[in-house]
Amino acid sequence: FLIGTSSDKTDFPYVMPGPDDTWGGTWRTSGWRTHDTNILFNISQKPKNGQCKLIIDLVDSNPNRSVVKVTINSIEKKFEIKGHSEEALEGNVQNAKEQILEFPFSTADLKEGGNIVTISVLEGGWIVFDQILLEGSDRVTLGDNNKYAFLRNVAPAAYETELEGKRVQPLLIDVEHLNGTPQLTVKLDGTDIFAAKLDTSRSIFEAPMPAVKKNRKSMYQVLVNNELIEKGIVLRSPQALQTLADYVDTKIGTAHSRWMIAPGPWMPFSMVKLSPDN
C-alpha cells in the first residue's frame, strides 16, 4: 500500500489472518503461513530530532490470542493481544472489543526518501483493522510519488563482485514497480553506471560501482524515465569478493534438497532415473 497513490477501499485488507487460521493458508500439507501488510511512504524532509507515534486501531482480534509484530524501517515492536468477538471477522461489531497498538519512535528512525511500515501476525489468529495513524512533528513532510516506480532504498553492498574481469562494489537499488515499463537509470558522479526496464513488482538491482582501495564518498542519482527521484551521497569502501553461495537466502525459498532428488539411496543410478532438485 503506497500512501498518496493506493486506495484504502481497494488496496488495503480489512482483515489479516494469523497462522492459526486455516483460511489464511496454514494446513498440514502447506505448513505454517504468516502474512504481512506493507505500507510504503515517501518523506521529502524531516527534523533531526523529534518524536512520532504509529497507532494501529483494531476493531477486534481473535478471542484466543494474536501476536502482532510492527516494523518501521529497521525498528520493531511486538504486541500480544486477546480479542473478544468472533463475529467481528464477518462484520458484526456489536460485541467487538477495540484494540489500540501504539508504537512511539524517534524521527531519526525515519529517512528522507522511501520508508516502510510492515504489520505481521506471527502467532495466533486474525486481526480486523479500523484505522492506522502516524502522528508526529508538522516538520515531517510527505514527498510526491513518481507515477511509475517507488524507490524503497539505496545502499552500498557489503561485498564486491566481478564484472568483465574487474572488481565492482554494487550499489543496491531497491525499487517497486508501479506502472508501465519505465526506464531506470543510475548515475555515479555524473556517469551512467546502470540502466534497466522495470517490469513487475519489487526488484533489487546491483548497479556496479568501480571498486576502491580506500573509503571514498560519491554522489549518486536515480532517475525514472529521465526524471530524478533521488540523489545522495554514498560511502564506497573495500569489501570482500562475493561468491554465488553468498546469495543463498532461505527466506526466499533457497533451502536443503527435497527427498525426491535422484539418483540417490532411495533410487539407485542403475534404475536410470534423473529427477530435478525440487
Residues of each region from the PLM?
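Contiguous beta-strand segments within globular domains
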Residues: G31-F41, Q45-I55, A155-D174
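Short proline/glycine-enriched turn/loop motifs at strand-loop junctions of beta-rich domains
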Residues: S61-N64, E176-P182
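Short, aromatic- and glycine-rich surface loops/edge beta-strands on solvent-exposed regions
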Residues: N115-S120, L184, R216-N226
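Accessory carbohydrate-recognition regions in carbohydrate-active enzymes
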Residues: K166-P170, H177-T181, I204-V222, G232-N278
